[in-house]
């Protein structure tokens, strides 16, 4: 009888010990889970990504952006990164941008070269500069590929944006943000590109043009933030194609706008559709026609839909200017 009582006591002690071990184990598991959760939350807080994925058509672009050094520089400060996404404060003004030239200078030089009041060389720093410009975008097909080509060559360009190309198109808006984020210049190519509205009877309608420019400015501000502004405009069809230029010139001066035309082009909007080799040849011909002293060239191209051959020709066009000793700059 005494032996049975002894066995029962030993059993109770063992059971109690076992329960204590179970409780300790549970406590350790819960503590580990809490600590692990805190570490994950802390790690996630310090690794905010700034990229956006409009849709599958620009996914390859997003992958390249996610691995860029610029993303790494802002990682770890979630409040600052989120602010940049909202107001695109990464878009630099002319004074802040080391890749930009003054729109007033570029506009004056280009105008003088076109109307014969200036002759090469026009720069005072001894450099040879080409300004790659793209009209009518952004497109969801060609603009992302053009951005990738420019990145590969570490070249910056100026994009003359159409308001109707981005209005109501979330993917195009994201591409515009990405264009600015990669350090390119954003300029105004009016909202509508409608010749009959802008130039009735082939005469510049100042009120309609200013209204169209301001409408485009408002749309771009909605996308890029209220701090965004651009002084650079380009008239659809160019400035010199229309009557009524005197009144338009006065309106531009009053509003602080600078029109920048072009003095070379790849002819991707001229005549029959051209392949990449023909676009390269057109570029060379229009550049060579400027003469051996040409030191400031504004090259017209397009990044809208249907300009896939422009994308294909762009690497060769960049290499052509590199071989001739040109520097690539933007216009702000």
Go through each PLM region and give its residues.
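Active-site beta->alpha N-cap acidic-glycine motif
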Residues: 94-204, 215-231
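Hydrophobic alpha-helical membrane context
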Residues: 29-30, 147, 201, 314
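N-terminal pre-catalytic segment of deacetylase/amide-hydrolase enzymes
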Residues: 2-10, 19-132, 139-144, 152, ...
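A sequence-composition feature that detects small, non-aromatic residues
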Residues: 27, 33, 40, 100-107, ...
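Catalytic domains of cell-wall/extracellular-matrix polysaccharide-remodeling enzymes
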Residues: 171, 193-300, 304-322, 326-327, ...
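Short, Lys/Arg-enriched phosphate-binding patches
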Residues: 16
């Amino acid at each position: 009888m005494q032996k049975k009582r002894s066995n029962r006591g030993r059993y109770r002690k063992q059971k109690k010990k076992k329960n204590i071990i179970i409780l300790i184990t549970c406590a350790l598991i819960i503590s580990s889970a809490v600590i692990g959760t805190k570490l994950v939350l802390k790690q996630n807080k310090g690794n905010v990504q700034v990229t956006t994925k409009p849709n599958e058509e620009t996914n390859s672009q997003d992958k390249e952006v996610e691995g860029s050094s610029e993303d790494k520089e802002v990682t770890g400060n979630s409040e600052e990164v989120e602010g940049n996404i909202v107001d695109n404060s990464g878009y630099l003004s002319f004074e802040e941008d080391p890749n930009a030239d003054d729109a007033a200078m570029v506009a004056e030089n280009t105008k003088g070269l076109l109307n014969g009041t200036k002759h090469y060389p026009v720069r005072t720093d001894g450099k040879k500069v080409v300004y790659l410009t793209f009209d009518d975008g952004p497109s969801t097909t060609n603009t992302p590929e053009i951005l990738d080509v420019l990145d590969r060559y570490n070249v910056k360009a100026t994009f003359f944006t159409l308001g109707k190309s981005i209005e109501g198109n979330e993917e195009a808006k994201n591409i515009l943000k990405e264009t600015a984020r990669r350090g390119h210049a954003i300029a105004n190519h009016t909202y509508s590109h409608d010749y009959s509205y802008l130039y009735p009877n082939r005469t510049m309608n100042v009120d309609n043009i200013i209204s169209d420019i301001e409408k485009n400015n408002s749309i771009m501000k909605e996308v890029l933030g209220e701090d965004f502004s651009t002084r650079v405009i380009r008239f659809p069809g160019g400035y010199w194609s229309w009557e009524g230029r005197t009144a338009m010139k006065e309106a531009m001066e009053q509003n602080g706008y600078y029109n920048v035309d072009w003095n070379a082009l790849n002819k991707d909007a001229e005549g029959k559709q051209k392949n990449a080799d023909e676009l390269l040849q057109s570029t060379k011909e229009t550049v060579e026609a400027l003469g051996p002293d040409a030191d400031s060239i504004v090259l017209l191209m397009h990044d809208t839909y249907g300009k896939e051959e422009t994308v294909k020709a762009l690497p060769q066009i960049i290499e052509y200017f590199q071989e001739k000793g040109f520097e690539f700059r933007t216009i702000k």
